[in-house]
Amino acid sequence: MVDYIQRPKSRFLRVKCNDCENEQIIFGSASRKITCVVCGRTLAEPTGGKSTITTHILEVLE
C-alpha cells in the first residue's frame, strides 16, 4: 500500500561535541546558532534552510 501522508523534511539530530564529547539533541533546520551546553563550541549554524552541522551526527531521530 502506498503511503500518501507527507512527512516533514526537517529532523531532530543527536550530535556529539568534538571538544567535550557531550551528546545533545538539536533541530536540523535551526534558525539560530547552536552551541554546546557544556563547553560553548558551535555545533550548527543557520544557512536559510537546513543548518550547517559542524560536529559529528550520531543519529537522525524520527
Curated annotation (Swiss-Prot):
Keywords: Metal-binding, Ribonucleoprotein, Ribosomal protein, Zinc, Zinc-finger. GO terms for molecular function: structural constituent of ribosome; zinc ion binding. Binds 1 zinc ion per subunit. This is Small ribosomal subunit protein eS27. Part of the 30S ribosomal subunit. It comes from the Archaea. A zinc finger (C4-type) spans 17-39.
